[in-house]
Amino acid sequence: MSNGIKVKKRNGRGMEPLDLDKMHKMVEEACKGLAGVSASQVEIQSGIQFYDGITTEEIQEILIKSASDLIDLDHPNYQFVAARLLLFSLRKSIYGKMMDLPDLENHIYNCTNIEVYDKDIFTKYSKEEIEKANSFIDHERDFLFTYAGLRQVVDKYLVQDRSGGGVFETPQFMYIMIALTIFAEYPKERRLNYVRRYYDAISRHRLNIPTPIMAGVRTPIRQ
């Protein structure tokens, strides 16, 4: 269903009708399982801000802001609605979809190919070790974030193009890459166990990471 508004596609190639049904399903997904929240309330708050020629990124930001504006003492779960909407937008911008993310090897390959990850990761670890590390990743842990927490990670810590604004990783890929980089020089027979345990601790937010490590340890600048 459309209301006549034309939307500029994310890839910049042409316009398409605003799909209200698709938007509703996404907001419903962001509200799923959370008490005291309403997809309709988020949509009502945001709907009057749409205009002809709006981009899909702008629509997403409007929805995120609408959900975050609803956060108060009586409705704290909107902080998770806003976080989920931000996460959906992040995944869509990086991978072109919200679910079914790439495996770790493909993700690392893409990021080393554009020189945002340190290419030495492929000399430090074998293909089999990277496949094993991939099995440690739980992308559902992205949904543990509150909106404020995820916004800080997106704005300050995820590997990105600071001039162009593109982001190249999601939180779980950030966490596993931090763990792999930190333990790369440890004995091979034990290091994957350390990687798994450290990844579990930081991805569940049980352990704080110093800013230089969180922001840069997996990149070519290595700090």
Regions found by a protein language model. Give the residues of each.
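Extended catalytic cores of very large enzyme megasubunits
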Residues: 1-223
